[in-house]
Regions:
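Gly/Ala-rich beta-loop-alpha elbow adjacent to hydrolase catalytic centers
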Residues: 74-78, 82
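Short beta-strand/loop motif that positions the catalytic acidic residue
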Residues: 119-120, 125-127, 131
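Acidic catalytic loop of the alpha/beta-hydrolase fold
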Residues: 129-134, 160-161
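Catalytic active-site module of serine/aspartate enzymes centered on a nucleophile-bearing elbow/loop
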Residues: 166-191
Length: 191
């Protein structure tokens, strides 16, 4: 069985609706999902811990899951933490990223991509085309430096929370289904 250590985003927690929906989707694909809260959430705070604390917390959760096939990743900030650990050489079989925060909202000049070329494992990253934290052109440029097999799955019309506008003719449930199909295809190739 494949285990996936799944970290939440800065404004979320292990049991927020987005985390639960993605976890169910992955579990339905036969992936054992391991969710956890970062220390600041456990303490009742909404302010994220410094990156070294976030990385140590996720590393601790990952160490509990050693033994089989291991994927790591997360939503937004949680995915960023996972990419930093992978770039530092943490052993895993791949990364699943949802709404990777390439830059702060409204600040596309502050890219969070310097570590990405150090990643050596396969990556599947799903981002919405309306994500204010990940301009598509900037992500595509950043990935030119990445040697690992990195698959971007762009969700047409979706925002950072994977919500779509009614006028798009799509529903959030359809977007979630599209993510499931992308993960299923990716897992077949990288299993």
């Amino acid at each position: 069985m494949t285990a996936f250590v799944f970290a939440h985003g800065a404004g979320g927690h292990r049991d927020d609706p987005g985390m639960r929906a993605l976890s169910k989707l992955l579990a339905d694909l036969g992936i054992e999902v391991v969710r956890f809260n970062f220390p600041y959430r456990e303490a009742g705070s909404k302010r994220p811990d410094p990156m070294p604390v976030l990385k140590a917390s996720m590393r601790k959760e990952i160490e509990r899951e050693r033994g089989g096939r291991l994927l790591i990743g997360g939503r937004s900030m949680g995915g960023r933490v996972a990419t930093m650990l992978a770039a530092e050489g943490l052993a895993c079989d791949g990364l699943l990223l949802f709404a990777y925060p390439l830059h702060p909202a409204g600040q596309p000049e502050k890219l969070r991509d310097a570590h990405l070329p150090q990643i050596e494992v396969p990556v599947l990253c799903s981002n919405g085309t309306r994500d204010a934290l990940c301009r598509r052109d900037l992500m595509e440029r950043a990935l030119e430096q990445v040697k690992a097999p990195w698959r971007m799955h762009w969700l047409e019309g979706a925002d950072h929370s994977f919500h779509v506008l009614k006028r798009s003719g799509r529903t959030d449930a359809q977007v979630l289904g599209e993510i499931g199909e992308a993960v299923s295809r990716w897992a077949l190739v990288h299993d």
